[in-house]
Amino acid sequence: MPSKKALVRRPSPRLAEGLVTHVEREKVDHGLALEQWDAYVEALGAHGWETLEVDPADDCPDSVFVEDAVVVFRNVALITRPGAESRRAETAGVEEAVARLGCSVNWVWEPGTLDGGDVLKIGDTIYVGRGGRTNAAGVQQLRAAFEPLGARVVAVPVSKVLHLKSAVTALPDGTVIGHIPLTDVPSLFPRFLPVPEESGAHVVLLGGSRLLMAASAPKTAELLADLGHEPVLVDIGEFEKLEGCVTCLSVRLRELYD
């Protein structure tokens, strides 16, 4: 039976110092961010996910975006080497967490860089964004780690947003959804559904037809509901100021086994 565990990490007191690349910096309300994070974690739990907190990394402003520190396929965890040097201290606590869960652990080594937010898994196909945070050596090391396990790794150019999953994610049937102005090459995906809002391109598959989505994408939620999906909306506005989205606030572990 597939596992339903999700790694999460409490926001750092220095959250407001987090990196911004493609947006203008806005003031972050730390108290409100904590409330929004709690509600996000509660939403996962309410839909059957066991949330596991990674030890906080208070000196790492971006550490709440825990997805960037690891990529898991089958029972193998690839600890990333983030493209932003200031984020590399985030990986140690995540490595400890996945090791406790029994994952086999591999690492991305210099000169490779890889952010987990650049990795979109659809079945046995792994799309990896080649952009500002993930380089060619990182793509090669991801391929070396997971192709022997049966994965098909497809590199995708990313130039308009921070990460691949800032531009696209996927529905339960494998259809990729994305906001056209931010998607470099939509034709790379076998099935592509345009959505009307930037944050509407980000969904977390909760199980069945349920999709965790940002409250900032009501038009997309309406579109997806009309297609038979069940949007579950959460307000993550303080994290969106830092280019965060619903996917990067957790690491969903669906394929763990004893």
Curated annotation (Swiss-Prot):
InterPro entries assigned to the protein according to its UniProt record, in alphabetical order: DDAH-like (IPR033199)
Single GO biological process annotation from the record: positive regulation of nitric oxide biosynthetic process
Transmembrane segments: none
Tagged with keyword DNA-binding: no
UniProt KW Nucleus keyword: no
GO MF annotation: an example: dimethylargininase activity
This protein's UniProt keywords: Hydrolase
UniProt-listed Enzyme Commission number(s): 3.5.3.18
Reactions listed under catalytic activity: N(omega),N(omega)-dimethyl-L-arginine + H2O = dimethylamine + L-citrulline; N(omega)-methyl-L-arginine + H2O = L-citrulline + methylamine
Catalytic site positions: H163 (proton donor), C248 (nucleophile)
Its biological purpose: Hydrolyzes N(G),N(G)-dimethyl-L-arginine (ADMA) and N(G)-monomethyl-L-arginine (MMA).
Protein name in UniProt: N(G),N(G)-dimethylarginine dimethylaminohydrolase
Source species of the chain: Streptomyces coelicolor (strain ATCC BAA-471 / A3(2) / M145)
